[in-house]
Amino acid sequence: MIPETFFLSPEIVKAQQFGQPIVALESAVITHGLPRPYNLELACELEAIVRHENVTPATVGLIDGKVHIGMSLAELQRLASEPKTRKISRRDFGIAIASKECGGTTVAGTLIAARIAGLRVFATGGIGGVHRDAPFDVSADLEELGRSPLVVVCAGAKAILDLPATLEVLETMGVPVVGFQTDEFPAFYSIGSSLPVTARANTPAEVANIARAQWKTGINSAVLVVVPPPAEYALPAAEVEIYIRKALQEADAKSIQGAAATPFLLNRVSELSGGASLQANLALLRNNARLAALIAKELSISAEGRL
């Protein structure tokens, strides 16, 4: 039963009725992750990429206190231009719904909504994780990954985080990290981090088989599929590290903490890299959406993929 606080677009309802593949897309990247006009352009482009593979996109977000699964162009435009939107994670749903607010769902927020709506595949840029020099500052994304039976396609965790610690928490949460055509955990802007993944898959069908096997066993955690950014846009890890350290120093000097920290750090890394990190971010988002669509098609081949 879908809660009355949810609204599934007619397109999503139809896709579910006919067993057609669907890919969930987050909206925090629209409301908080990218500057205008890139945010709306990218939201539309990601949906187009998914549609190109004959898969239905389901952008998730809050409009006037309703959790939308699938959005119209007008709704995407509103989220992209609304001056005050809340960043929606697990703790924020009740507040935003009661206040009839608009909001962009984080990885955690999107996982919750997608799970309730019965979706099985989700594409994002990078997950949250354990913050550097702040081991008690752990993203809610990790816990939701541990209890959400979805395939989540990403480029690893955001490079501003403590990647080894993030992988340790994922292990604790029972989340397998599957490298797509890679044996290393990607570092978001960079191709590799020298950190090993749990397993490797070379095709979308292999990913689908892993997910089916996990869920048939009754293990309801996510399968985290990590994909390196496209090589032509990837940045050298050492170069990115210089930008991150400088951005962290500035954030500390300005006492920027909590939910404001990640947007500030990502924006400063973009400025320090002359926009190269932004272009890498856009490229990996496109790449992840395409792969997620291919995996969704493989899962939809068998009714077992729609448990």
Task: Identify the meaning behind each predicted range.
Residues 1-19:
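N- or domain-start disorder-to-order transition segments that initiate the globular core
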